[in-house]
């Protein structure tokens, strides 16, 4: 679990280093596989991400589907945040094949 939290923190550091070049605070979306409140693992991931975002001055949006198996909800959340113009996305995909095309399009734009 500490490895995954470190990975999220490192991702936030990477994104903040490349994104904070502008004058306004950047927004990063963290999409987890399932609800953090009911799962100690994801609750720890969320807590670590919030701490890192606060330390780095990054706006953090944490979203997860209502159920870990709800692929379409995660896809809709990602598409919504991309449409809103988030500056970065850190994701634990529910189904990597379902989100890959969306993320490829986001990186290309």
Where do the model's predicted regions map?
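Sec-dependent signal peptide recognition
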Residues: 2-10
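A residue-level marker of the well-folded mature domains of exported/periplasmic proteins
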Residues: 20-109
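N-terminal signal peptide c-region/cleavage motif recognized by signal peptidases
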Residues: 16-18
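Short intrinsically disordered, low-complexity coil segments enriched in acidic
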Residues: 1-2, 109
């Amino acid at each position: 679990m500490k490895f995954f939290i470190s990975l999220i923190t490192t991702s936030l550091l990477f994104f903040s280093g490349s994104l904070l070049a502008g004058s306004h605070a950047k927004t990063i979306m963290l999409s987890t596989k399932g609800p953090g409140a009911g799962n100690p693992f994801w609750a720890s991931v969320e807590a670590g991400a919030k701490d890192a975002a606060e330390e780095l001055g990054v706006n953090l949006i944490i979203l997860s589907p209502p159920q870990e198996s709800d692929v379409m909800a995660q896809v809709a959340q990602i598409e919504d945040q991309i449409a809103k113009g988030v500056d970065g996305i850190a994701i634990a995909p529910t189904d990597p094949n379902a989100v890959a095309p969306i993320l490829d399009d986001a990186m290309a734009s």
